[in-house]
């Protein structure tokens, strides 16, 4: 298709400008808000991509240690009361849990992309677990 030169066109028709009744009060409010600068906002998705790159580079644990430790103790309490854990054992459990979750989210994202979506949904996670053989 051939390119065509675009020329400026004058706007024909439309509504005639109206006289404002409260022009003085409008001018006052405009001058006070003109000094205020709008906060800077990134486009949707920019911050998400930056966070993805940041977390892919890093190796630190993403779940806080104490809440995870409380969760482990709460679950262990159901099986046997008065259990004690070495700190290295809790750390090993946390490493394994985070590795599993990251892997599951990667597979879930692939399922969403396969469905021509960019948003993951519960059905993507169910499909990923079903393919892995974790859930029938």
Swiss-Prot record:
What SUPFAM superfamilies does the record tag this protein with?
Histone-fold (SSF47113)
Keywords noted in UniProt: Acetylation, Chromosome, DNA-binding, Methylation, Nucleosome core, Nucleus
Native species of this protein?
A: Euplotes crassus
Q: Which family does the record assign?
A: Belongs to the histone H3 family.
Entry protein name = Histone H3
Give the compositionally biased regions (Basic residues). Answer: 16-27
Q: What is the stated purpose of this protein?
A: Core component of nucleosome. Nucleosomes wrap and compact DNA into chromatin, limiting DNA accessibility to the cellular machineries which require DNA as a template. Histones thereby play a central role in transcription regulation, DNA repair, DNA replication and chromosomal stability. DNA accessibility is regulated via a complex set of post-translational modifications of histones, also called histone code, and nucleosome remodeling.
Alphabetized GO MF terms: DNA binding; protein heterodimerization activity; structural constituent of chromatin
The organism's lineage? Eukaryota, Sar, Alveolata, Ciliophora, Intramacronucleata
Principal place where this protein is found? nucleus
| Protein's UniProt keywords contain Acetylation | yes
């Amino acid at each position: 298709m051939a390119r065509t030169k675009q020329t400026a066109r004058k706007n024909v028709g439309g509504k005639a400008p109206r006289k404002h009744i409260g022009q003085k009060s409008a001018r006052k409010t405009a001058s006070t808000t003109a000094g205020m600068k709008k906060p800077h906002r990134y486009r949707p998705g920019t911050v998400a991509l930056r966070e993805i790159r940041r977390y892919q580079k890093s190796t630190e644990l993403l779940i806080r240690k104490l809440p995870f430790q409380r969760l482990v103790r709460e679950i262990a309490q159901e099986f046997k009361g008065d259990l004690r854990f070495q700190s290295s054992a809790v750390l090993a459990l946390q490493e394994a849990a985070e590795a599993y979750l990251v892997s599951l989210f990667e597979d879930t994202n692939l399922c969403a992309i396969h469905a021509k979506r960019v948003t993951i949904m519960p059905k993507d996670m169910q499909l990923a677990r079903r393919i892995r053989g974790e859930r029938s």
